[in-house]
């Protein structure tokens, strides 16, 4: 368990300190009065931006340009309408979620229509039975299958999909790690197809990168959903890997509505079992290798990173199958004896016993302080049920403080074994507000508002799913609290833009590109 409290870094912070510090005279003697006046006037009007800010910052504070303004890119390829929402705007997030769900359903249905026969041959006819249970015609009482059996079939089918996808990804990773001469014919074909997709993705990212400004935080956008889907999927489970509708594990699960059936019959929500469409490490690798080919071994690292998400999902479904379903069956039998319920049906009361409170589901939960809400907000990030971990990441943008803490595990019906360590969310929240109250940089009004906020519960603003693994999410949070270079790039612009950038850095990660600039030449022409 860990707790870290740290001051956030912004551009201009050290510059301002340098201009008013006791060492300022030495700095002025070094850079000359002209540069001093130029810097002071620009800082005073808050107009230093882009390369200008980076260069002046470097000269005045004596830092290298490597610690100043560069290009910062979110490690996410965005399709149309995929912009990151403001975490403090539930309406904005809700609309985006609904649009994405509709688009996913359409694409998944296309996969079922196109590859239905091949999918059923590979994964069994029970997939069609599950689909018919959810979408088929209403059958008579005597024809209806026992609901618990359908539930078990859905869980087994989902596990089978994840295990198969895991094997395929490992095969591709092994092929990429081998020398070209040692690959089998099938491995060579897989690598060739994957390389073609990566080349297409690299070209698309290059086009976007060329159009970026040398300032602020950028997003790679402009690819249609179909092109994105085709370019980012490593291996199809059925059919061609170069088609626009690719039969991946995620697409097959959605096409046959496995998670929906499990939720409808048991009340167990598995919507958190996701894999990133495009692995953030893949985008980072592509950005690093701008004018050269990406080595096979680095591609293998990205494939294995995406496979980590599949492995975590496989562990989760095994946890549900081995730990939860036996308990579910036992409670079902008890309810039947007590209430005399029909053998074929699962009583809603049984489902309610396995419901997890919304605030404890494996998602990123967003809260804000009741007062000064625009500046003071925090994320409660919860892991998969089988891992039963969570952490707190709080920001006060008014006084530039970040607070990270590992929290105690929750108890709920789907959780793994409990371990009594760590503090609760409320305890972490109150300490976070105490920081703001006691800080030397806090205004009296802000301190009063934080004291008032401490006496009541924070405002819950909803939640968001994350596609990466919980460990990667935690790594991104670590970078957000430690990496000063990253903080300087995400804490720029209007407040709502800064909050979006923080959420993007948490969900996807940010790559700061270190393009060199000739500082003496820049100053000569300044």
UniProtKB/Swiss-Prot annotation:
Any GO BP: symbiont entry into host cell via permeabilization of host membrane
Principal subcellular localization: virion
Keywords: Capsid protein, Outer capsid protein, Viral penetration into host cytoplasm, Viral penetration via permeabilization of host membrane, Virion, Virus entry into host cell
Region described as Involved in membrane permeabilization: spans on this chain: 1-42
GO CC terms, sorted: viral outer capsid
UniProt-annotated location(s): Virion
GO molecular function, one term: structural molecule activity
InterPro entries linked: Capsid_VP5_Orbivir
Protein family: Belongs to the orbivirus VP5 family.
Purpose of the protein: VP5 protein is one of the two proteins (with VP2) which constitute the virus particle outer capsid. Acts as a membrane permeabilization protein that mediates release of viral particles from endosomal compartments into the cytoplasm. Permeabilization activity is probably negatively regulated by VP2 and is triggered by endosomal degradation of VP2 and exposure to low pH.
Name of the protein this chain belongs to: Outer capsid protein VP5
Species assigned in the record: Bluetongue virus 13 (isolate USA)
């Amino acid at each position: 368990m860990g707790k870290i409290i740290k001051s956030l870094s912004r551009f201009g912070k050290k510059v301002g300190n340098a201009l008013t510090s006791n060492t300022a005279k030495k700095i002025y003697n070094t850079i000359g009065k002209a540069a001093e006046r130029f810097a002071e006037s620009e800082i005073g009007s808050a107009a230093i931006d882009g390369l200008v800010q980076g260069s002046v910052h470097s000269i005045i504070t004596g830092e290298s340009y490597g610690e100043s303004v560069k290009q910062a890119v979110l490690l996410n390829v965005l399709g149309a309408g995929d912009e990151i929402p403001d975490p403090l705007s539930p309406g904005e997030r809700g609309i985006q979620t609904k649009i994405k769900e509709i688009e996913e359903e359409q694409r998944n249905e296309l996969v079922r229509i196109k590859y239905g026969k091949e999918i059923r041959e590979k994964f069994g006819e029970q997939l069609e039975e599950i689909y018919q249970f959810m979408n088929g015609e209403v059958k008579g009482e005597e024809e209806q299958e026992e609901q618990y059996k359908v539930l078990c079939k859905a869980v087994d089918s989902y596990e089978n999909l994840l295990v198969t996808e895991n094997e395929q990804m490992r095969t591709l990773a092994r092929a990429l790690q081998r020398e070209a001469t040692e690959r089998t014919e099938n491995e060579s074909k897989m690598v060739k197809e994957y390389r073609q997709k990566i080349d297409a993705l690299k070209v698309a990212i290059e086009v976007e990168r060329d159009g970026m400004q040398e300032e602020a935080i950028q997003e790679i956008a402009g690819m249609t959903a179909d092109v994105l889907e085709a370019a980012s999927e490593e291996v199809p489970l059925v059919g061609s890997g170069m088609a626009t509708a690719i039969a991946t594990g995620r697409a097959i699960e959605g096409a046959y509505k496995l998670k929906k059936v499990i939720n409808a019959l048991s009340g167990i929500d598995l919507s958190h079992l996701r894999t990133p469409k495009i692995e953030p490490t893949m985008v980072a690798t592509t950005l690093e290798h701008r004018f050269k080919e990406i080595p096979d071994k680095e591609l293998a690292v990205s494939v294995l990173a995406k496979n980590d998400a599949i492995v975590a999902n496989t562990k989760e479904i095994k946890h549900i199958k081995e730990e939860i379903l036996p308990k579910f069956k036992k409670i079902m039998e008890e309810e039947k004896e007590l209430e005399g319920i029909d053998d074929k049906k699962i009583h809603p009361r049984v489902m309610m016993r396995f419901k997890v409170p919304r605030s404890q589901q494996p998602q990123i939960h967003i809260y804000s302080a009741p007062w000064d809400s625009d500046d003071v907000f925090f994320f409660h990030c919860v892991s998969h049920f089988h891992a039963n971990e969570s952490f707190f990441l709080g920001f006060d943008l008014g006084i530039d403080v970040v607070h990270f803490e590992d929290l105690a595990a929750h108890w709920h019906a789907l959780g793994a074994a409990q371990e009594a360590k760590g503090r609760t969310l409320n305890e972490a929240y109150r300490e976070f507000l105490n920081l703001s109250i006691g800080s030397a940089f806090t205004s009296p009004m802000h301190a009063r508002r934080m004291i008032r906020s401490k006496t009541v519960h924070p405002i819950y603003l909803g939640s968001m799913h994350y596609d990466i693994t919980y460990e990667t999410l935690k790594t991104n949070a670590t970078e957000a609290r430690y990496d000063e270079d990253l903080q300087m790039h995400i804490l720029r612009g209007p407040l709502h833009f800064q909050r979006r950038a923080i959420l993007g850095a948490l969900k996807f990660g940010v790559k700061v590109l270190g393009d060199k600039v000739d500082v003496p030449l820049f100053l000569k022409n300044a």
